[in-house]
Amino acid sequence: MEKKIITISREFGSGGRTIGRQLAEKLGIPFYDEELVDQVSLESGFAPKFIEEHSEHSPGKSFLSYVFAPQGVPGVMNGLSTADFLWSIQCSVILQLADKGPCVIVGRNADYVLKDRDDCLHAFIYADMDYRADRIVRLYGESEKSPEVRLQEKDKRRKVNYQHYTGRSWGQAQNYDVCLCSSTLGEEHCVQILLEMVQNQNNK
């Protein structure tokens, strides 16, 4: 089966977003990251920044789940938590983007949302702690928290969110077609491996 859709799941700071963007450029296909968030924002009524900050949070019907919801948002007004409402919209948007044609989608549990499609290649990018810590400091600067703590907190949110909505273990090899260590291979080599995988599948 020809692989048209590539999903990139990743540990925070591993370079998965960069790898996905470069892969999309080499394949000449759309890359969905911020664009996906913008579409979810358009359909949900939430600001993109709010979605970025809350779509990976653990679900729950706490008071704060409703306080920050835009007035009149149907899902939230009907009793869904903000996290559940965003998940519903996010799934819909991912399916729409995949139906449009070949693309690379980063994060957002897209590997699970598109698990029933045969034309997808699902990748997970990880890296060792020192590599990731150095990378986020270079990209995002210092913080009151150590880079190691920031990495652990971000990864934990992704892990809990993924497990809740998919019933799977985040980062477990059996959930993906390939897992690549960017700190060992380097970002460029990761891109090349994924490119060759897509091309080999499409040439069969």
Which role fits each region the language model picked out?
Residues 2-10, 101:
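Pre-Walker A (Motif I) flank of P-loop NTPase domains
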Residues 8-21:
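Glycine-rich phosphate-binding P-loop
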Residues 30-41:
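Short beta-strand-centered segment that lines the nucleotide-binding/catalytic pocket of NTP-utilizing
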Residues 41-102:
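ATP-dependent small-molecule kinase phosphotransfer cores
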Residues 61-69, 143-188:
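Small-molecule kinase domains that catalyze NTP-dependent phosphoryl transfer to phosphate-bearing small molecules
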Residues 97, 103, 110-116:
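RNA pseudouridine synthases
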Residues 116-138, 144-154:
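Conserved phosphate-donor/acceptor-positioning beta-strand/loop module used by diverse small-molecule
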